[in-house]
């Protein structure tokens, strides 16, 4: 009986400590990234969101509805303001198309165009094209522990494992308990800071902790950054196949 008890308990201990290393039980960076990806991951999701863009000449709001399937398919329709209403974007793998109702044209966004701002915000088309799974793009190392928003965080240094990537490295602050990224600095290959993200609010949606208010800042641009609000989110939603087609851009 004693041997049977050992056989049952030992695998449980291995499972509980699989992501830990060192005397102080510091988690491995790659294990933390995996947990972050698990928290955000979903086969399908539908979201409505509002961007508040704080530019040199004032602030403006842009509202959108976003359909996401897996890691490489998304469809975005802009709902407001009237000037942007009806603009749509489709991402399929490493390709991105945009439809403009004012010109009734669909164009493919590629090359240097990917670095351009989305709707004048601090986010680029390149940001939208990123693989949402960090572990697919970076290796991670825990470099410290800090508090952010009164939450204890692991501080991670992420280094790119791919050549064709917008940000060679990142520094991220991950909530120890909820496995949510609360703060992030993004760097060029030479170490120059390019963009920052600060999460202002986290909410539990469908048993997942999700940032619902964040401030993005392109440090190379003037202005006070872009606030991003998640107004609603449905995980594992039913999404018709036609949504992820070029024909849907003109509907």
Where are these regions (language model features)?
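Short, conserved active-site entrance elements at the starts or edges of catalytic domains
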Residues: 121-159
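N-terminal mature ectodomain segment of secretory-pathway/periplasmic proteins
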Residues: 27-102
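Short hydrophobic/aromatic-rich beta-strand segments that constitute the beta-sheet cores
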Residues: 47, 74-78, 96-100, 106-108, ...
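Acidic/charged, solvent-exposed loop-and-adjacent secondary-structure segments enriched in E/D, K/R, S/T
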Residues: 101-129
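Bacterial N-terminal signal peptides that target proteins for export
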Residues: 1-10
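Bacterial Sec-dependent signal peptides at the C-terminal "C-region" and cleavage site
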Residues: 18-26
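Bacterial N-terminal signal peptides
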Residues: 9-19
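Gly/Pro-enriched, hydrophobic low-complexity segments
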Residues: 129, 149-246
